[in-house]
Regions:
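Hydrophobic beta-strand residues in large extracellular and virion-surface proteins
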Residues: 40-43, 47, 55, 75-78, ...
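Phosphate/oxyanion-binding active-site loops and adjacent basic polyanion-contact surfaces
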Residues: 35-40, 68-69, 99-104
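Short coil/turn segments at secondary-structure junctions
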Residues: 26-31, 69, 91-92
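Domain-level recognition of nuclease-like catalytic cores that cleave nucleotide substrates
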Residues: 2-14, 119-163
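Active-site metal-binding core of divalent-cation-utilizing nuclease and nuclease-like domains
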Residues: 31-32, 46-84
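Interdomain/boundary linker segments immediately adjacent to catalytic/signaling cores
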Residues: 1-51
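Nucleic-acid nuclease catalytic cores
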Residues: 88, 93-102, 106-144
Length: 163
């Protein structure tokens, strides 16, 4: 199996998969990774309760770029509807990180632009803990993410508690 890549170069095609690729195992996750997955699932359930069937959690995608085949799985997508003309891509992290920006913009963005060519994308890192050393464009509430007047391509939402 080839090494994971976070940057796509020369994307040729991309498609959504019905299931997780067979060769990707489901190991028993422990520690900080488990805590991160629990946080992601909480965020996904919260967003599904608000936005229903427009929410896609854990969708796998296959793509081919100059380096060959690759696979990726954005945490959460919220599809456009009558009141919202953009696709929202959410990456959940326990702690704010620059890695999320790279993942969202150089891995997920090219794949999703290929699959949804007529739709604008908004990328959001949802975090449980902030890093005071990172300069972040913060959004105050989940409602601000969906506000048509606030134009942005990438931002961070601090969601410690879901109440």
């Amino acid at each position: 199996m080839q090494k994971r890549r976070n940057i796509i170069r020369g994307l040729r095609w991309a498609k959504a998969l019905q299931d997780k690729p067979r060769f990707i195992s489901s190991p028993r996750i422990k520690g900080i990774q488990r805590a991160g997955l629990i946080y992601e699932n909480r965020i996904a359930n919260y967003i599904k309760a608000l936005y229903g069937d427009k929410v896609i959690h854990g969708q796998w995608y296959e793509y081919e770029d100059r380096r060959g085949l690759g696979w990726c799985q954005p945490d959460i997508l919220i599809l456009p509807d009558k009141s919202r003309d953009f696709l929202l891509v959410i990456e959940c992290k326990l702690k704010a990180t620059r890695k999320a920006w790279v993942q969202l913009n150089y891995l997920y963005r090219p794949v999703l632009e290929k699959i949804y060519p007529q739709v604008d994308l908004r990328m959001v890192q949802v975090v449980k803990n902030l890093d005071k050393n990172l300069k972040l464009d913060l959004i105050d509430t989940l409602d601000d993410v969906f506000c048509q007047e606030k134009k942005f391509e990438y931002s961070t939402l601090f969601l410690r508690n879901l109440t």
